Regions:
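Short glycine/acidic-enriched loop and turn motifs that connect beta-strands
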Residues: 77-78, 134-135, 197-200, 278-280, ...
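Short consensus segments that form the blades of beta-propeller domains
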Residues: 46-49, 72-73, 129, 167-169, ...
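Beta-strand-rich domains and repeat architectures in extracellular enzymes and scaffolds
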Residues: 38-75, 253-262
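Beta-propeller blade termini
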Residues: 54-62, 110-119, 174-183, 255-264, ...
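Blade-level signature of beta-propeller repeat domains, shared across WD40, Kelch, NHL, RCC1
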Residues: 652-694
Length: 779
């Protein structure tokens, strides 16, 4: 105990001295993690990358070392992911390492699809991507600092000549992903795609740009009937040349194809792999023509049992194929991933949905031989709970370490599309947290919901908070039942510092009343709760981020805790105090799916408000409780190591994106980390940058003369002030752990049952003047 006590003293002294000498610089966040995550026997290599839903893969040299690194563009969220090709920890072999710094090198307005191909033969992969209306635009990769990519727009609209001297856009439609490859062997990149009108026939565009390698200035349409095949409405159904027409009166699938050309049988001609929207199969179509340009696809060469009847590709919706060396053996493998734009109608699982088919061929030029090697390429090394993840942190097992709950929008499990709550127990130490998956259905919420299939159980968003002031964390969760969204709570019947005891049979839900005479305020799908003492009365209040666009007000609602006035009825604990708290806007309009989090992120002793919107915007409102009316905040929060500048978040954008945020000081270093739940079902971990660990005491501190002793303390501490004050104790996530005391000059703080770590003691005088200091609770 004495050694631990002295360690705390040394840590506090070193930190205080270092911070006193540090220059005053802007606060922000940088990607990084303090915790490991273990599932089964595996430590997740990319635990905090944020999950993947619909990645489109390409290779590119990101760091200028001459090795092929990996780029993934997630279609659903329009987010870029970058992975470096690095040496394995064992010293032999290679592995992928998530490296988010490189994501900022790619254009921020990408959408639809993005593929990297070297069109000018300079050894640097260029960028082909969707343009508005279904056109294709191209960015040239020029040499950047340190050999890193730098993209410059080379052609904002590919085109080709048509009759009578007219020029037409090379338009592939909004849902197709083309094959961009050298089809005729002249060294130039050509384009094969389904037509933009109905996506029923294949069109081949040959690159005729000048030069031995060419560019992207000139294309001609070689044929609008490549392969002499027409797709039929049924999955894996085609009308081949000379065959009967497609069967009528079948259910039509939405137009959309993702294609890849590969020589699958070693005859020197490129064959076709075709993935279709709303279809699970990847169809192989062998080329029986005289050349790749003069392709001929036949019924005899078509198979939906690819690559083998024993292990065919079968994804729930819209498989898209990609060819690259995924396992570092020098032979290109096949990776297949979903390629739909969203999951709002399909209701499929987005976990373990990226298939890696290892190529067992002896060389890159040999006939490929694909076999299933992984059902979750990269995903299996990430925290990934399917989609719409939302975290909450707290000590659930009473061991003094912070555990993690991770909820999701929903997942398809055993035929039921239901939300669930994952429980990750912290099995590490106070300074080195390690999360181990303990349950993928904490409290059996998903299993119980599956017993009532007619009632939805989706958009689960948890919070851990002491509602009844007994020192034990209670569970609150927002959930959508198909008609309304409820804020459900379950009181913890265990004593403080003991393993949590939640009974779903005792679950109830808040009935927050509106302003006088307005009645109950409706709740919408995706509403996200956050608890914090807003008015400083010692009772935790409710901030509700909402997607409500019908009711008057804004996206952030402030519900005040009535305290004793509620008469002990937790159902009616909260009353609407402000329906448009902070008057928050995102680019001039009401931010959708707003998710709030409160903590002292910048270390100045004052709580800050952080919000995420469904557009991927992250805002920080420092010391928000001192602001009135429209809150002033910033979105330039995330440090770019390449430019040494702060930039807005790059979490993606889309029609419906659901994010969530939570703060937790997992390693007890005095700075809360930021954890962002993503639409893609994962978590991103950010560390504070240039925050203050021990906040400098302002002028008010001199007037109140707050003194804490002993500090560190184990069981109790004394707080003294020069004038009568009320004292409260918060953890670094902003949660009230000891309520307000009566006005006095001397206060005894009971620390029994508190987890070791740093806390904030706030002393407030009768006139509202307040000051804060950090208190270390020793083991």
């Amino acid at each position: 105990m004495r050694r631990s006590f002295l360690l705390w003293v040394l840590v506090l002294g070193v930190v205080a001295q270092a911070r006193a000498q540090a220059p005053a610089t802007q606060f922000g966040f940088v990607f990084g993690s303090v915790a490991k995550v273990v599932q089964g026997t595996d430590t997740l290599a990319h635990a905090w990358a944020g999950g993947l839903n619909t990645p489109q893969f390409s290779t590119i040299d990101l760091d200028g070392d001459g090795r092929a690194d990996l780029y993934a563009f997630d279609r659903q969220t329009a987010r870029s992911y970058t992975f470096l090709n690095v040496a394995a920890a064992s010293g032999t072999g290679r592995r992928w390492q998530y490296a988010p710094d490189y994501e900022s090198l790619f254009p921020g307005d990408l959408s639809g699809w993005a593929l990297l191909r070297d069109y000018d033969c300079d050894g640097r992969a260029d960028l082909f991507t969707y343009a508005n209306g279904g056109d294709i635009r191209v960015f040239r990769n020029v040499a950047g600092t340190g050999g890193r990519p730098s993209f410059v727009l080379a052609n904002n609209q590919l085109s080709f000549p048509v009759a009578n001297g007219f020029i037409s856009n090379l338009n592939i439609g909004s849902y197709n992903t083309p094959a961009i490859q050298d089809v005729n062997g002249d060294g130039r990149l050509d384009i094969l795609t389904y037509d933009f009108v109905g996506s029923t026939v294949l069109e081949l565009y040959l690159n005729t740009s000048p030069g031995s390698c060419g560019g992207v200035s000139n294309f001609v349409q070689s044929t609008n009937y490549w392969g002499q095949v027409v797709t039929c409405p049924d999955c894996s159904s085609y009308q081949f040349a000379g065959a009967t027409a497609c069967r009528p009166y079948r259910i039509e699938h939405s137009a959309g194809h993702s294609i890849l050309l590969l020589d699958l049988n070693g005859d020197g001609k490129l064959d076709l792999l075709d993935g279709r929207d709303n279809c699970p199969q990847l169809t192989r179509l062998l080329n029986g023509g005289t050349s790749t340009v003069d392709g001929l696809l036949t019924a005899g060469g078509a198979s939906s049992a690819f690559p083998s009847a024993a292990a065919p590709v079968s994804l729930p919706v819209f498989p898209a194929p990609y060819s690259f060396d995924a396992n570092f053996d020098g032979v290109p493998d096949l990776v297949v991933a979903p390629n739909m734009t969203d999951n709002t109608l399909d209701f499929v699982s987005m976990r373990r949905s990226i298939r890696l088919y290892q190529n067992g061929a002896a060389s890159a030029s040999a006939v490929p031989s694909f076999s299933l090697a992984s059902d979750g390429f990269l995903q299996n090394d990430m925290l990934d709970v399917s989609e719409g993840s939302a975290p909450a942190f707290g000590d659930l097992d009473g061991d003094g370490l912070t555990d993690m709950l991770l909820a999701n929008q929903a997942d398809l499990v055993n035929g039921y599309y239901r939300a669930s709550l994952y429980y990750y127990r912290n099995v590490g130490t106070a300074a080195r947290p390690v999360f181990r998956l303990a349950s993928d259905d904490y409290l059996g919420l998903a299993a119980t919901a599956a017993l009532m299939p007619s009632v939805k159980f989706e958009s689960l968003r948890p919070a851990l908070v002491d509602l009844n002031r007994d020192g034990a964390l209670d569970l609150v969760y927002s959930v959508w039942n198909g008609t309304t969204n409820r804020l459900t709570y379950i009181l913890n019947t265990a004593a403080a510092s003991q393993p949590a005891s939640f009974s779903t049979a005792r679950a109830s839900y808040f009935k927050p009343q509106g302003a006088a005479g307005s009645g109950v305020l409706p709740a919408r799908q995706g509403d996200t709760p956050c608890f914090f003492d807003i008015d400083g009365d010692g009772y935790v209040d409710l901030l509700l981020g909402t997607n409500d666009t019908q009711e008057a007000g804004g996206s952030l609602r402030y519900f005040r805790n009535q305290g004793p006035a509620a008469g002990g009825n937790v159902d009616n604990l909260f009353v609407l105090a402000n329906a448009n708290y902070g008057q928050l806007l995102d680019n001039g309009s009401r931010p959708p799916y707003l998710a709030p989090a409160v903590a002292d992120f910048n270390g100045d002793g004052k709580p800050d408000l952080l919000t995420l919107s469904g557009r991927g915007t992250v805002m920080l409102y420092s010391d928000f409780r001192s602001q009135n009316g429209t809150f002033a905040g910033t979105n330039e929060l995330f440090f770019n190591n390449f430019t040494s500048q702060y930039e807005p978040a790059r979490l993606g954008k889309g029609f419906i994106l659901r994010f969530a945020a939570a703060a937790a000081d997992l390693n007890r270093d005095g700075r809360p980390e930021l954890y962002v739940g993503t639409e893609t079902g994962g978590l991103i971990s950010y560390l504070g940058r240039n925050g203050t660990v021990l906040a400098a005491r302002p002028a008010a501190a001199a007037a109140l003369a707050l003194s804490l002793y002993p500090n560190p303390a184990a069981q109790a501490a004394t707080a003294e002030t020069a004038q009568p004050t009320s004292v409260r104790l918060f953890d670094l996530a902003g949660r009230l752990v000891r309520g307000a005391s009566p006005l006095a000059r001397t206060h005894r703080l009971d620390l029994a049952g508190l987890a070791p770590g740093l806390y904030v003691v706030q002393a407030t005088a009768a006139d509202g003047t307040s000051t804060s200091q950090r208190l270390a609770v020793a083991p």
